[in-house]
Amino acid sequence: RDLRMSRGLGDVYKRQYYRDMVKKLIVFLFVAGMGIGSLSAQLAKTCFTNMPDSLSPLLTAVNRADFIDFLESKMKAEVTNRFGGKSEMTELTPDYIRVQVTPQSTWQMKLLSVNDSTRLICTVSTVCAPACDSYIKFYTTGWEELPAASYLASLPNMDDFIVPASDTVDVYRYQDARLQADMLLMKADLSGKDATLTFTFTTPDYMEKEAAEKLKPFLRDPIIYTWKEGKFNN
């Protein structure tokens, strides 16, 4: 339509029209050449909005699109989910998303580079009832599931979170508390700032309060895995 309209313009207006078009083209080429990062910045939200409904039972396609629109408009990104509850996207970066799906559950995704040309998606689903426990999965950017063992060789075990007793007095306290820590629970968190995965020991949250207090002096700090050479390593 613009071309048809331009035919009826005088030469002066034609020249101005084409100058404007050239300026826009130059700006576009500059952005395309220098702004590769800004193009890749669209990828996290694009992957999220394109996620199959089968992988997002509580959030509809409209919910997911609304999250993005609200945050980009500097608004609180809260929606009514498929079951009538409230869900909120709390973080959105070029390669990371975090959603408070329900008051007791969260969902995170992170785009990770496998090599110079390939990225994959890592997701962490966490449910707290009341102790938190997480499930980690990996997908292609087209949401085809990948074998987790290829990208996360091993998970921390109970002994990774607990320091052995150092003296005879501690041994009895340690053994008593350790026997009650009979189920490994841990919360995993992806980072929006770097390519790390942090595991926090949550077994004490389900134990009796007295036993949890006895175990507390023997607990190690959260364990951090770093994404390197296409997999998470401790």
Which residue stretches match the model-derived regions?
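Mid-length scaffold segments of soluble, non-membrane domains
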Residues: L120-S154
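Acidic/hydrophobic-patterned starts of short beta strands in beta-sheet-rich repeat architectures
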Residues: D116-T126, D194-T200
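Bacterial Sec-dependent N-terminal signal peptides
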Residues: K14-C47
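Terminal domain-start segments
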Residues: Q42-L112
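Short, small-residue-biased leader/transition segments that mark boundaries at the very start
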Residues: R1-Y13
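Short consensus segments that form the blades of beta-propeller domains
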Residues: V99-Q100, T126-C132, A211-K216
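Short aromatic loop motif centered on NTY/YTY
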Residues: A148-W227, N233
